[in-house]
UniProtKB/Swiss-Prot annotation:
Gene symbol of the encoding locus: HIR3
Top-rank taxon: Eukaryota
Subcellular location: Nucleus
A biological process from GO: chromosome segregation
Protein name: Histone transcription regulator 3 homolog
Length: 2020
């Protein structure tokens, strides 16, 4: 949640309020109607009818359709039944989340509840009032003992029940309901209502409470009376009854105890009402109670003809049982009540018949077999009954829960209400909360929400399928009907139940009622039996194609009359006679109605059981009926039936698949023969005409009997069928249908033709079934005309088709010899046929038009044959085509087979199959379909020629068939959805069953995947520009996406080895110009490989697909699309997106690119090109696109990657990652590794595509950024490694040149910024920056690249540079051109006009003598310059983002400074310049009252300019714009202006004041920050300029103290200043000048020591040193010398020390001249003589004692008193000789180094004189320090001058400490070593160490204590952080013990020899550790920016955590020292 919320924002209108308003309207309307009804109701009996009409109108209001209008009980009952709650509300309201209780207790919900409550309450009262009217008008009313519920009593109770449901807290209404319940004699309801009336909110089990209202008190009294009447003492003991038992109701109130006194109340007494009333009551109870009791008590009886037949078969031996059965039927009342037999009640009747015939004598087992279906039915019925019972119990429990009373009814405390015991809420409020809880957990809503994604996806897919089929021209209505069913099912929850397609229903049944044996048919790969000749006839059965629909046999009709008839003949009939009569009765319906399978089975079993009886009875009847037509007519139905059924039975048991034994067959054959004779005799007796149906039936059956002879002649059978056909046709016998006979279901000429065709085509099929038929051409020629006649043409010649047995062979020969594939249908539309082909086509016609009769017979036969047979034929044809490598025709055969299967699943044969057998057939067919889908899909995907001969008609038919297949298979998904969501429970069973069920589901999912893939391939082949919806490619992509969504959300798109995902990936990569392909491809890649593209509108969904490893081949295919996506996104966003991860993964898969010779060649050319000097002409040629670099083409697999810009993309990603932090705002150096990686990929891109401009541009950027990194953070490389910087600049300029040249003729897209603008701008910036400091035109200078040229005259050569160098003016001119081009593309970028104005100004200032003729003529004018400046100011001011943002100062400052310079130059009058400035946004207006308004003098203009600068400075609140400050100072102090020394001093002080206020602190710390728009490297240039200016000002002001502090700061920050060495030298010279001036030390002309010998000088030097230790501090000359020595230590040999030594020499010389003679002591010459004398004596003594070998003892005695030699130590004889020899060799006097040595010794002696603390000698001689300083080299003296210096160092080391350390340690030695010769190394090292030590000692003396040898490392902030001064006496007195606190730390970092140039920051940080610590403690008063303080705080925190700082800390300190 946000921490605050705006209070001034008005909330938007809430849609819920609109919904509530709609509800309020409904409530208001209902209340108006209620008031109208109530008004009429109150008018009494005269308005009863009007009131009733008003109430009816009231209950038609909208509020009574709301869910709230239903009672708890109704909702519970509906939920228990699984019925969704119906609401007539607007779907938009309910979908929007309608809150029924919106508005709270007093809102709409409360009004709605009140309206419902009042309506129902008064409606019930209305009927009570009608009873009251009747009681007064009807005299018989008082005689009524009770009311009837089904009269108006039901309306009263129902209305009041609904009202109490709305408000159960109305005790008065409860009393009325109880009273009315008593009127209808319901004690139970009465008691319940009274208990509800007195049930309190507070539980009486906790505390005893009185009834809160009078109504509740009366209810309690009534309940007490009722309980006493019933004698229920247990209920009376309940605590709630206590108030009524303890207290007595007054008689006054008891009169009002009965709320409805005019109604009867039979419950007042336990005596029941009258008998008539009792009967009525019983009837009422029966009506109100369960109706199932009657059915439970009635016994099961025979209720159908089939059951009667089965019963008679069982009681053939017991006649009495047969009659008892008939008697039971007579007594039964169920006749003519239809009972539907379940479709899956019994097994196939054929198998039952076969069993019945096989064992005719086993009477004991027959009843069991017969009863099996009954038992199954009984079992199923029992299951259903148990299920119903369970459902009923569930309903009862729900109802009970809805009527459940509170726990107080049982005397138990209600724990849920204990917390609310103090707060009593109304029942209505609690009721509302219960409603809310129910609505939030409504299961129907949850189910609907879960179903919605599946429904939406399905609707989209099938609607799209329908649309595509319509556009393709499909006209199959059944296809669209099936698809429409599926689409319509998306609007319901019970989706599978809405599908009516029979095959789909079968699939649903297979899944829902799963049986493992059924699934095995589909799952197991059992080899099918090969189709042979014997099975041919079985597959060629006629079937029921022509059989008309017959009415079903009513198995109860006439059953009772038959039973009554049999019962009347009980005296003479036997059981066999009853059986005969039963057969005779059922024979009446044999030819007129369709028997059920159970009935057919009963008839066949009866024929088998009583065959002999039937034969005997029929024979007797025929004999008796001879001559009597009437009696013969009685046998008209039974005789033909018996004969025909025996034919049917014999056919069944003799088919090839029958397993009936031979004996049974022979017995059946014998019976058939007998019945043939009977039928023949009967027909002769009746003597009917030839066209009589009985004659036709007999002839047909006779032919069938003849065809089943032992060795029938085929020709004879054929002739018989032909004769029969002719007879039927000639006699015009109408078609006869025998619905109960399988073998002869239809008798007609057409059926006879089918039989004939079966015989005539037998040879044809017998040939096909031969296994040795290996000639594929013969198979094709044979089968193609039969299976696919539309594609076969016959030659237009010929021969008449023959008939008879030769017709088949002739037709075969014709088709074999002349049949060809119909090219007219299969040829493509794009190719035109030649005239010859056209003429040849005219000679042909379709085989359908000239087919022989045998061929037609084949077609007829196949039309009626089984699916397996036709599939087998198509398979043989496909195999034949495959054998001749005609794959496209094999593919066509597969498609035709699929169409065949789909057609047969919709055929009548399939529909008429028995359900159980149909499911098995369906699973077998599904298995065949799956195999065909696999074969067809493999061809469609892998064979490019698969669709070559597939014409449009073929595509339409196959697409329609596949659409049906997909609809069919989708039913499996619908069933699984129901289980997944929870509509249906998961099936239970053992592990094997579950495994089989899961295998079935997986197999179906795989089939769905394959079917959808094949459907897509068909659509792809059929869709073109003429029949597409949007566009061919868009249609296909959308269709793939729709399929993916449907199978993806169901988590099975991974099925079938992810074939669909792979197909979709390949197809999406092929399709171009499609919409939303990012979403489509992104989801596919995520499913396949787990990759996310991060683009598109949709989020990828988890489809539960395990990712596969991405291969290089697949990656190469994806590169194009990934590059397109990456190029669409801004590069910064790309680095944060999922696409970046995908790109990295792809690059890992691709791996490193191997270089080829061509790539090496290109790279070598590029490298050589970048080394070339910059040719001016090449730059200008680039503007017209005429510059390129030589490269050869590269052909490798990776070339395609470069073509799509893959390597450029990788390079841009690395480059953008480096640029992620803006260069100007970065606080640490960038990760140059990313920069180099980016450059590597860009070079790789250019090796493939050398003409890619953006690659050259970005490579130039890489060089630019590398250059910026080199100069941004430190000035080291600018000062030391300039060749590397020049290389970067040249590389960048060359790359920019090529980028500019290649981009001139291209149309550049600007989706991610404007790269072309960036090219122009950055190229111009590079050119301009290279022309200015610190680069100073060096990239354009190539004097080092000279070559020899041959002279024009002569044979000599001369050396010259390659071409003329580019001057500054040309560079500025070229840059200006680029800036103008950039302005054209981005006019709102202020930097372009700003930099253009700078270029113009530089060009404007250039003298004409430096320009060529062309440049002079086109020189920049003054107005152009000023207009450009104005433009820059305008654009920059408009670019400001808001008032609270800082303005862009650079253009404002630039126009001020340039106008000032123009005024100073005299080019622009001051007034005009002031007018221009006043027009600017930040300009200062000139008022006439201003004293400078006249601008008569230069001072007026300067004052005006200074005021302008001050205004800009005020705007710059962050103090970033240091150029404004320095410009102000330079205006005050103009170096170019000649003024007097006094004025110069005043100007200098004014300028110093400006700088001191804003730029320099009191301790001379310079605070200069790098501005955002400042070019990298310029900061160091500015700091150098500012230091030089400050130095000049301090020199003029003679401010030596500030200059000394400035030098200290400058010395520590050497890496921050451009030209630091020169800057340091100039500042040092200025400081030395001030020293001489301050102490009046002039150069000494004469050598003051020329008269002294060295020995005498030593004596004098000792005296001067002693003097310096005592009285030297008071002498100015000595102070000057001391400061000079300290300065020399600070210098640390960075500058040559000669000027410092000169000052020391001059100071010491003057001290000698002025002081030495005044010092006490003997003459120096005498002292020298005494010393010589002592040495001589010592030498003599030594020589005398040589013989005694006591040299050492004598030496100790002689040297002991020589205290003056303690400095140099005890002399050895060799040293003595050397010392004696020295005076003799040096006669010239005192040398200069000796003087300097003595001067330093005197200063050291003076510094160590007071020793308040421990001696500093120990500090200097620390072993740790000595081990870390380069003093080892001191022994290697390089020259004669090193001797005295070394002596000075030794003396300093023994006698005292150095005084100052400021310069750092090792890196300072680097400077010294670079500037001086190696002979001075010893002196440099020692002086450096001394200086460093003394500086830290001074700086740490006040604020720190030396904690350890490593010193303090808490460099928490820089000098730049605070601007306060240190105490005045800070540097005067430093405790010696603190002077070396940082000594160990300073020396352990690195050695001067090994220090890298890039580690300057480390050295600077180390140098500043001591001094800055102390300064920061005191400098707490003034700050210039917030960043320093923040940095300081951060560093302090880090210091506390890390007591020892690493090198990187020093680097950070160095960065902060720059001024960040």
């Amino acid at each position: 949640m946000p921490a605050f919320q705006a209070i001034n924002l008005e909330p938007e209108d809430n849609i819920d309020e609109q919904i509530d308003t709609t509800k309020e309207i409904h409530v208001d309307e209902a209340l108006k109607r209620f008031q109208h009804a109530l008004k009429l109701h109150a008018q009494g009996p005269r308005s009863r009818e009007a009131a009733e009409a008003a109430y009816n109108e009231l209950f038609e209001s909208e509020i009574f359709k709301y869910r709230e209008a239903k009672t708890d009980y109704e909702r519970a009952e509906r939920y228990a039944d699984g019925q969704p709650e119906v609401s007539n509300l607007d779907p938009s309201l309910t979908d929007g989340g309608l809150d029924v209780d919106a508005g709270g207790a007093d809102g709409v919900a409360a009004s709605l509840a009140q309206a419902l409550y009042l309506s129902y309450k008064n409606y019930g009262q209305f009927f009570v009032d009608k009873f009251k009217d009747a009681s007064t008008s009807d005299t018989a009313w008082k005689e009524k003992a009770q009311l009837k519920y089904h009269d108006d009593g039901r309306k009263v109770l129902d209305s009041w029940m609904t009202a109490l449901d709305q408000d159960p807290s109305d005790p008065e209404l409860w009393r009325k309901a109880a009273r009315f319940a008593g009127a209808i004699n319901s004690n139970r309801i009465k008691r319940y209502c009274l208990e509800a009336a007195i049930e309190l909110d507070d539980d009486p089990a906790v505390m005893e409470l009185d009834p809160p209202s009078l109504a509740e008190g009366m209810a309690g009294e009534q309940l007490k009376d009722q309980l006493k009447l019933l004698g229920d003492d247990m209920a009376l003991s309940h605590p709630i009854m206590a108030p009524w038992l303890k207290k007595k109701m007054p008689a006054l109130l008891k009169r009002h105890l009965d709320p409805i006194p005019f109604l009867p109340d039979p419950t007042k007494s336990l005596i029941p009402p009258k008998v008539s009333d009792t009967q009525a009551q019983t009837q009422e109870d029966t009506e109100m109670g369960d109706a199932d009791n009657a059915s439970l008590t009635e016994p099961k009886s025979v209720s159908s003809w089939a059951e009667l037949g089965a019963k008679l078969i069982n009681c053939l031996e017991t006649t009495a049982e047969a009659f008892d059965t008939c008697d039971g039927i007579v007594e039964s009342s169920l006749e003519d009540v239809p009972i539907e037999t379940p479709p899956n009640e019994i097994e196939s009747v054929a198998s039952e018949i076969e069993v019945a015939v096989t064992k005719p004598t086993e009477t004991e087992k027959s009843p069991e077999k017969d009863s099996t279906p009954k038992e199954q039915k009984a079992g199923s019925e029992g299951t259903e009954d148990s299920q119903k019972t369970a459902d009923q119990s569930q309903k009862d429990s729900n109802g009970a829960s809805a009527r459940k009373r509170s726990q107080s009814a049982a005397g138990l405390p209600d724990g849920a209400e204990e917390e609310n015991a103090m707060e009593k809420r109304s029942k209505r409020v609690r009721r509302r909360e219960t409603l809310q809880a129910e609505e939030t957990t409504d299961p129907n809503t949850l189910i609907a929400n879960q179903l919605q994604p599946y429904q939406g996806a399905d609707q989209n897919l099938f609607q799209m399928t329908k649309s595509v089929l319509e556009h393709l021209g499909v006209e199959d209505k059944s296809t669209f009907a099936f698809i429409t069913e599926l689409i319509d099912s998306c609007a319901t929850e019970n989706r599978p139940g809405k599908i009516t397609n029979l095959a789909a229903c079968d699939l649903s049944s297979v899944i829902v009622n799963f049986r493992e044996e059924v699934a095995k048919v589909f799952l197991h790969k059992n080899e099918q039996a090969s189709l042979g000749p014997s099975s041919f006839l079985e597959h060629a059965k006629t079937g029921s194609q022509d059989q008309p629909s017959m009415p079903s046999f009513n198995e109860k009709q006439g059953l009772r009359s038959f039973a009554r008839k049999i019962g009347g003949c009980r005296s003479w009939m036997t059981a066999e006679d009853v059986a005969y009569e039963w057969v005779r009765a059922v024979s009446q319906s044999y030819a007129t109605a369709k028997w059920s399978d159970k009935m057919k089975l009963s008839v066949v079993q009866m024929l088998n059981k009583v065959d002999s009886t039937l034969y005997r009875k029929i024979t007797e009847e025929m004999e008796l009926a001879a001559g009597s037509a009437e009696r013969l007519a009685d046998l008209e139905t039974i005789v033909p039936m018996l004969f025909e059924l025996h034919v049917d039975i014999y056919e069944l048991i003799t088919n090839p698949s029958s397993v009936v034994d031979y004996a049974t067959r022979m017995d059946t054959k014998y019976r058939l023969g007998r019945w043939l004779d009977i039928a023949s005799a009967y027909l002769r007796l009746i003597d009917r005409p030839a066209n009589d149906p009985l004659i036709a039936r007999f002839l047909w059956a006779s032919v069938l009997v003849s065809s089943h002879a032992e060795q029938p002649l085929r020709e004879h059978i054929l002739l018989m069928w032909t004769s029969l056909r002719d007879h039927l046709a000639d006699e015009k016998v109408p078609a006869i249908s025998l619905p109960n006979n399988v073998v002869m279901p239809t008798i007609s000429p057409a059926a006879a033709d089918r039989e004939i065709s079966k015989l005539t085509t037998m040879d044809f099929f017998l040939g096909l079934f031969q296994d040795n038929m290996d000639d594929p051409v013969f198979v094709i020629d044979t089968l193609e005309p039969v299976l696919n006649p539309s594609t076969v043409c016959a030659p237009n010649q010929g021969t008449d088709s023959e008939s008879g047995e030769d017709s088949d062979s002739s037709a075969s020969s014709d088709t074999t010899g002349a049949s060809t594939l119909d090219s007219s249908d299969d040829s493509t539309d794009d190719n035109d046929e030649s005239s010859d082909a056209s003429s040849n086509q005219k000679q042909k016609k379709s085989i359908s038009d000239c087919a022989s009769q045998s061929l037609k017979d084949l077609w007829k036969f196949l039309h009626n044959s089984s699916t397996e047979l036709r599939l087998f034929l198509w398979s043989r044809l496909g195999d034949a085509y495959d054998a001749i490598n005609y794959s496209t025709k094999k593919f066509s055969c597969c498609l035709k087979s699929i169409e065949l299967i789909v057609s047969d699943l919709e055929g009548e044969t399939y529909a008429n199959t028995v359900p159980e057998s149909r499911r098995l057939l369906f699973m077998r067919t599904l298995k065949s379909l799956d195999e065909l889908l696999i074969t067809a899909l493999g061809s469609a995907l892998n064979d490019n020629t698969a669709f070559e001969i597939i014409d449009d008609a073929h595509i339409r038919s196959t697409s329609a068939a596949l659409a049906k297949v997909n609809c069919l298979l989708h039913v499996a998904s619908l069933c699984e959805d129901e289980v997944r969501i929870g509509i249906k429970p998961e099936r239970t069973g053992n592990a094997a069953s579950k495994a089989a069920f899961q295998a079935l589901k997986n197999k179906l999912k795989e089939m769905q995947i394959r079917a959808w893939c094949l459907q897509y391939t068909m659509f792809k082949a059929g869709i073109n520009k003429d029949n597409c919806i949007i566009g061919p490619e868009n249609d296909l992509a959308d269709y793939l996406a729709a399929i993916h969504q449907v199978i993806g959300i169901r988590k099975f798109c991974k099925a079938s080895n992810k074939i669909f995902l792979k197909v979709m990936r390949v197809e999406l990569l092929k399709l171009k110009n499609i919409e939303n392909w990012e979403d489509y491809l992104g989801q596919v890649l995520y499913d396949l490989h787990g990759l996310k593209l991060g683009a598109g509108v949709w989020e990828v969904q988890d489809h539960a697909c395990p990712p596969e490893k991405l291969e290089k081949r697949q990656t190469m295919q994806l590169v194009e699309r990934v590059c397109i996506l990456a190029n669409r996104m801004p590069m910064k966003d790309l680095l944060k997106s999922d696409l970046k991860t995908t790109i990295d993964h792809m690059q890992q898969t691709i791996g490193q690119t191997k270089s080829t010779p061509q790539m090496y060649h290109n790279l070598r050319n590029f490298t050589e090109y970048l080394k070339k000097p910059i040719h001016p002409l090449r730059l200008y040629r680039a503007l017209i696109g005429d510059v390129s670099v030589d490269a050869v083409s590269v052909n490798t697999p990776e070339t395609i990657l470069a073509t799509h810009g893959w390597f450029f993309l990788l390079g841009m990603m690395a480059l953008t990652k480096f640029k992620g932090v803006e260069l100007n705002r970065r606080q640490t150096p960038g990760a140059t590794d990313d920069l180099r990686i980016g450059a590597t990929f860009l070079r790789l891109q250019l090796q493939f595509t050398a003409d890619r401009w953006d690659a050259w541009f970005r490579l130039a950027e890489c060089f630019d950024y590398e250059l910026d990194e080199a100069v941004l953070w430190t000035a080291d490389k600018m000062n030391k490694e300039r060749p590397e910087l020049v290389k970067f600049q040249r590389n960048a300029i060359h790359c920019y040149t090529l980028a500019l040249s290649h981009s001139r003729n291209l149309d550049i897209e600007t989706h991610d910024g404007d790269p072309l603008h960036d090219l122009y701008h950055k190229f111009a910036m590079r050119m301009y920056a290279s022309s200015r400091e610190p680069f100073a035109m060096e990239p354009f200078q190539h004097s080092d690249q000279e070559r020899y040229f041959i002279e024009d005259m002569g044979i000599g050569t001369f050396k010259r540079i390659l071409h003329s160098q580019m001057n500054k003016y040309k560079v500025w001119k070229f840059a200006a051109k680029l800036f103008r081009m950039a302005m054209d593309r981005k006019p709102d970028n202020w930097k372009n006009p700003y930099m253009l104005s700078k270029c113009y100004w530089k060009m404007y200032q250039t003298p004409d003598d430096q320009l060529d003729v062309k440049d002079i003529t086109s020189k920049i004018g003054l107005m152009t310059l000023i207009d450009t400046l104005k433009k820059a100011v305008e654009v920059a001011h408009n670019a400001r983002r808001g008032r609270n943002t800082d303005p862009i100062f650079e253009p404002h400052y630039k126009i001020v400074t340039i106008l000032h310079k123009l005024v100073i130059r005299g080019d622009v009058p001051a007034k005009d310049a002031a007018e221009i400035l006043s027009e600017q946004p930040f300009g200062l207006e000139v008022n006439p009252d201003d004293h400078f308004a006249s601008f008569s003098a230069l001072e007026d203009w300067e004052e005006y300019i200074i005021r302008n600068l001050s205004k800009l400075k005020e705007k710059d609140k962050a103090n970033w714009q240091h150029r404004i400050i320095i410009r102000h100072a330079k205006i005050l102090f103009d170096e170019a202006t000649e003024v007097s020394s006094e004025d110069r001093l005043v100007n200098a002080k004014a300028a110093f004041g400006v700088l001191r206020d804003s730029m320099f602190t009191k301790t001379m710390v310079m605070n200069v920050w790098k501005c955002d728009a400042e070019r990298p490297g310029r900061h160091h240039v500015y700091t150098e300029q500012y230091v030089r200016l400050m130095t000049k000002l301090l020199v003029i002001m003679n401010d030596r103290g500030n200059l000394e502090q400035l030098l200290r700061r400058l010395r520590k920050k050497g890496a921050d200043f451009y030209h630091f060495t020169d800057l340091w030298q100039s500042c040092c010279m200025a400081y030395l000048k001030l020293l001489r001036q301050g102490y009046n030390v002039s150069p000494v002309a004469d050598d003051a020591f020329k008269a002294l010998s060295s020995e005498e000088f030593e004596v004098v030097g000792e005296r001067i040193a002693d003097w310096a230790a005592s009285d030297g501090a008071e002498n100015p000359l000595f102070n000057c010398m001391k400061e000079a020595i300290e300065f020399k230590k600070l210098n640390a040999n960075l500058m040559k020390v000669a000027p410092i030594d000169d000052l020391l020499y001059d100071c010491y010389s003057r001290i000698y001249s002025e002081i030495a003679k005044t010092l006490p002591g003997p003459d120096p010459s005498k002292v020298v003589e005494e010393r010589h004398h002592a040495k001589e004596v010592a030498a003599q003594l030594e020589a005398a004692q040589t013989e005694t070998k006591v040299t050492s003892s004598l030496a100790s005695i002689l040297n002991a008193p020589n205290g003056q030699e303690s400095i140099t130590g005890t002399a050895t004889p060799m040293e003595t000789e050397k010392q004696e020899a020295a005076p003799r060799s040096r006669k010239t006097g005192v040398r200069r180094p000796d003087v300097l040595r003595k001067a330093e010794q005197a200063v050291i002696r003076a510094l160590e004189a007071p020793k308040p603390n421990k001696s500093r000698v120990g500090s200097v001689s620390s072993g740790k320090r000595g081990s870390r300083t380069p003093n080892q080299r001191a022994s290697d003296a390089g020259s004669e001058e090193d001797g005295p210096d070394s002596q000075i160092r030794r003396e300093a080391g023994h006698d005292g400490d150095v005084d100052m350390k400021d310069a750092g340690d090792e890196n300072e030695e680097d400077h010294g070593e670079e500037e001086h010769d190696e002979e001075n190394e010893d002196e440099q090292d020692e002086e450096h160490d001394e200086a460093a030590e003394d500086e830290n000692a001074e700086e740490h003396g006040v604020e720190e204590k030396a904690d350890s040898e490593t010193g303090s490392i808490e460099d928490s902030a820089d000098d730049e952080s605070d601007l306060s001064d240190v105490p005045e006496d800070y540097d005067e007195e430093v405790p010696p013990g603190l002077r070396f606190s940082n000594l160990g730390h300073q020396s352990e970092e690195s050695s001067g020899e090994d220090a890298d140039s890039e580690s300057e920051g480390d050295d600077e940080a180390e140098e500043s550790d001591g001094e800055e610590e102390a300064e920061e403690e005191a400098e707490g008063e003034e700050t210039l920016g917030i960043e320093d303080t923040e940095l300081a705080d951060e560093d302090e925190d880090e210091d506390e955590e890390q007591p020892k700082r690493s090198g990187s800390w020093a680097a950070n300190d160095s960065i902060r020292a720059v001024g960040w």
